[in-house]
Amino acid sequence: MDAASGILPDYAELFCRSNFSFLHGASSAEELVERAAKQGYRGIAITDECSLAGAPRMHVAAKAVGLPLVVGAYFGVTPDDAAPGHDPGPGAFGLVLLAQNREGYGNLSELISWRRMNAPKGTYRLTPRMLAAPPRALAHLRGVPDCFAILVPTYPARADVLDAQLAWFDALFGERARLGLVQLQRALDGAHREQVRAAGERRGMHIVALGDVTMHIRSCKPLQDTMTAIRLGMPIAECGHALAPNGEQHLRTRQRIAQLFPADALAQTCRMLDACHFSLDDLRYEYPHEIVPAGHTPTSYLAQETWAGARRRYPDGVPDTVRQRIEFELALIADLKYEPYFLTVYDIVKYARSKDILCQGRGSAANSVVCYCLGVTEVNPQQSTLLFERFLSRERGEPPDIDVDFEHQRREEVIQYLYEKYGHDRAALAAAVSTYRPRGALRETGKALGVDPMLVERVAKEHRWFDGSRDLLARFASVGLDPEVPLIRTWAEIAARLLNFPRHLSQHSGGFVVSRGKLTRLVPVENAAMEGRRVIQWDKDDLEALGLMKVDVLALGMLSALHRAFDMITAWRGPPLPDGRPFRLEHIPQDDEATYDMICRADTVGVFQIESRAQMSMLPRLRPRGYYDLVVQVSIVRPGPIQGGAVHPYLERRRIAAGEAHGEITYPSEALERVLERTLGIPIFQEQVMQIAIVAAGFTPGEADALRRAMAAWKRKGDLGKYHERIVAGMLERGYSREFAEQIFEQIKGFGEYGFPESHAASFAKLAYASSWLKRHEPAIFLAALLNSQPMGFYPPAQLVQDAKRHGVTVLPIDATKSGWEASLEAQPGAAPPDGRPAVRLGLSLVRGLGEEAARRIGAARAAGPFASVDELARRACLERRDLEALAAANAFATLAGNRRDALWQAVAAAPIDEAVRPALGAPTEADDVFADYRTIGLTLNRHPVALLRPALDARRLSSAAALRDRRNGRLARACGLVTARQMPGTAKGVLFVTLEDETGCVNVIVRPELLERQRRETLDSQLLAVSGVWQCESDVRHLVAQYLEDLTPLIAGLRTESREFH
């Protein structure tokens, strides 16, 4: 029947590109599925261009609404000079491939991988030869078996061209071949339809209706035009015929579709849909087999290694509680057949340890005693109230997630080990989806719309963030743009739509996928930007949704710094014990009073995890005095506890517990007391929220884990509501008040912002304490280790050096006659190892423009004897002129040539200069040296730049950081310093936190939203910022609440400083 009879024919859209066809598709998978379901489609296909990147999201969305999904891909096919019998004739055409079953999906995935790895980025077209005669290793892909193939003719179709193409197409694809008909309300649609109909009839090939969909609704057309312009690198006004002539490439109503297409072409869509039996749920991950030695099964080998590790962890005997826990975990792991996963991670960690690469597991894996015994994690589950179900349970239906951090400077060794062990065909990194950020969206959209480039740059520079088009229009108005002007309104609307849109695939920070067979038959693989690496087309969320294994091989800078510090301690002071083993983490004394005193003062610049502005503000209030306090400290300065209203109640209860405040710490029940006792009755961790659900609302452990997942997703999907009634009813049934039940639910919602797992915090707290101990007891070694581990951490080298100098560390300048590539330790006059405190000699790595190889040659030449002049150094180390100039500008020739200017002259001359002809060069001023230092090495050992300005700042009545420390609360105050950080946490409600540094320390500044809007340029662009406001000092937490800002950057014009922006 047709529309005329009153009954609409069924229809399935089989040609649909999402926004993972980058800069082609203008709608997300979720939007496309929702629209197709609303229109009553029988099903839908996802056919992104040479890609399956969007397939998992489409799968999840379609599954949620019960809409059948076909997985496929689209390819452009261009003619080639193939051998006779392979040439489809002149002209290009489109090819849609749809997987009919698991085998067809594997073939499609392998075809995509082949093209992606052997074509320039963005040019993934096929040729007839590739389809008909692929390389011998891929001969099984000839004709892409078990996939429907739809030829999409070039518009408008020509009979001779189409006949030639169909003859070739039919011979290659046979009964799987179909001829696609696209109708987009273009001028020649009637003629095109007739040509397609006639060609299909002559060839006896089924014709199938196609929508060539790139957007879910017509109103996305301006966004699609903008993306076309971005893709072509020209304004929309110059794109001409490259733009779609109308908005017909959307999911049209079935009434409209019935009017446009023949009934047989519509019926064919449903017949093909019904013939495609593949779902991404059919994918089955097979673990590698190399990890199990001969004579063992995965079960027996994991048990053997776990019990051996338990004996090492508990040399005085494995406690009964641990023994029972090991037996329980091993039984569950075996039942779920996850032993190969644990053994894969164990193998990676074993390799790293064999190469003396520092590593540590974190995240939910710290809940597992098996991981602890295997040496994957360092947190003893007995010492924390951890929850194994946060890591693994029967109800989860997917493998656990084990994250392992490695030294960031040596992680590549671990990655290459995986490639060598499993081969590039079986190992690849997970993808990360790079999306449009605020500035990029504004810039790209503005250029596409033809906005004046200078205006585009000014607006983008001043808008690091925005929240939707209304917010953006208001911000535009604040910088003098009229929101009523159509161009400005369009700019705001499209930029807001483009925000967070997928832009391209990059590589995940360390998620690795390894498989037993060819990975390309599980998921498409392509070359990563870094040579020697490959990346799959799915990200970590896709892998999780499909239950596929990922091993996180992550990089952590602090592990590099700790390892370097430990080695320096051993070299400087000798081994810590008579056995001669080097200093390591276990040799750091626990519960060191001096270390905790330093932490409580928030003296934590450079320390892991507790060095940020927010953490420093919390430290004097929470006052950690032990390891578990640090676990709480790491976790509490997070959106989850903040939004859940946990911070102030917890701090108040700490004061009550310490006898500093009146009150009583109570618990709603004995059962909840066991859950919340360690955090004084206030839920801080994700595990506690799960345990509350189990103990107080009757959830099973698996259901509690599902709640945790919903918590993590509710801001994005809003699906926490279904748990509200269950939690409240369960708590009422167990005797809790409705008020308390509602309070708990609100706290759970708060954790949806970002609740920190205790297992994660427990791992990080160990590193926080270790780095704090080093800063307190070995500050010079700690500084050298941090400098040699850059880039890492919160602070650039300039701030690390200034902080170390304030702590009495002697920092010696770069000297080509003494410095190595890295920072090193030297004895100070009158002090010697092992008891003396060393000085730090800065390394040549800081010199901008100097390569490591040149620095190594200097070191090798120096080892043969001292240098008498710059010329001799240049000759013996074979330095080029650019190397000499870089060293001279950095004042590295001071001991050979005097001041910087003389050194530069000698470097240019590259020979000793006769005193009679040497120009009379005046010595540079202190200010000259400071500016040159920042320009050439990024820091100075001379006076702080602000110290040089102190007379001028005093005249403006601007106080130093030191002078403000003792000012009374609520007094007016003025300060000035270099901007070293700007932060706006998601929980700050528009408040910006700015850190200023002067010669005496740092001032923390609070800039409220209204002031930020009034003085956006001063706030965001100043290098040297003066602030007038109200001084607040409470519980050793000090900050300046800004009322007026002044940009004094002209006073330091030309000074190159670094600041941490919005991290």
UniProtKB/Swiss-Prot annotation:
Its main location: cytoplasm. One of its GO terms (molecular function) is 3'-5' exonuclease activity. It is found in: Cytoplasm. Keywords: Cytoplasm, DNA damage, DNA repair, DNA replication, DNA-directed DNA polymerase, Nucleotidyltransferase, Transferase. GO terms for biological process: DNA repair; DNA replication. InterPro entries: DNA_pol3_alpha_NTPase_dom, DNA_pol3_finger, DnaE2, DnaE2/DnaE/PolC, DNAPol_HHH, PHP_dom, Pol/His_phosphatase_N, Pol/histidinol_Pase-like. Its EC number is 2.7.7.7. It is an enzyme of class 2 (transferase). The keyword DNA damage applies. One of its GO terms (cellular component) is cytoplasm. It catalyses: DNA(n) + a 2'-deoxyribonucleoside 5'-triphosphate = DNA(n+1) + diphosphate. PANTHER family: DNA POLYMERASE III SUBUNIT ALPHA (PTHR32294), ERROR-PRONE DNA POLYMERASE (PTHR32294:SF4). HAMAP family: DNApol_error_prone (MF_01902). Belongs to the DNA polymerase type-C family. DnaE2 subfamily. DNA polymerase involved in damage-induced mutagenesis and translesion synthesis (TLS). It is not the major replicative DNA polymerase. This is Error-prone DNA polymerase. It comes from Burkholderia mallei (strain ATCC 23344). The gene is dnaE2.
